[in-house]
């Protein structure tokens, strides 16, 4: 039983570490990068250096947990211009988008 628990724990960790991008096809990834540049860029700046919204550059996001960013994208920020994207994007797509933003992809 103990051996099974260790194996199961290792499997769960491996699943958690599997990149999200493996599940999204390249066409959808390209669409998300377009959305990032044009939709997110309309408030956060086309080069993501800020504007109506805060900067979305990797160096500005180091201290932000990915889960915080995912929740912000999904649910918006009440009292701010940040709209919710839940219903338009899946959680998996938002996770991929947050990873791309944190890597500086599309800059």
Where are these regions (language model features)?
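Sec/Tat signal peptide C-region and signal peptidase I cleavage site
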Residues: 18-23
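Alpha/beta-hydrolase active-site loop signature
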Residues: 47-50, 79
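Sequence/structural segment immediately N-terminal to covalent heme-attachment motifs in c-type
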Residues: 26-47, 68-75
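Bacterial N-terminal signal peptides
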Residues: 8-16
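Short cysteine/histidine-rich zinc-coordinating motifs and their immediately flanking basic loops
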Residues: 52-56
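Charged, solvent-exposed alpha-helical segments that act as regulatory interaction surfaces
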Residues: 49, 106-107
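Bacterial N-terminal signal peptides that target proteins for export
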Residues: 1-8
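Extracytoplasmic electron-transfer domains, predominantly the class I c-type cytochrome c fold
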Residues: 58-106
């Amino acid at each position: 039983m103990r051996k099974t628990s260790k194996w199961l724990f290792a499997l769960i960790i491996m699943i958690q570490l599997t990149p999200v991008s493996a599940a999204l096809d390249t066409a959808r990834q390209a669409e998300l990068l377009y959305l990032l540049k044009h939709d997110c860029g309309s408030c956060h700046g086309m080069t993501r250096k800020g504007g109506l919204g805060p900067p979305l550059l990797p160096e500005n996001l180091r201290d932000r947990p990915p889960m915080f960013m995912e929740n912000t994208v999904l649910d918006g920020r009440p009292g701010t211009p940040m709209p919710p994207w839940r219903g338009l994007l899946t959680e998996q797509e938002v996770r991929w988008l947050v990873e791309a933003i944190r890597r500086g992809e599309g800059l």
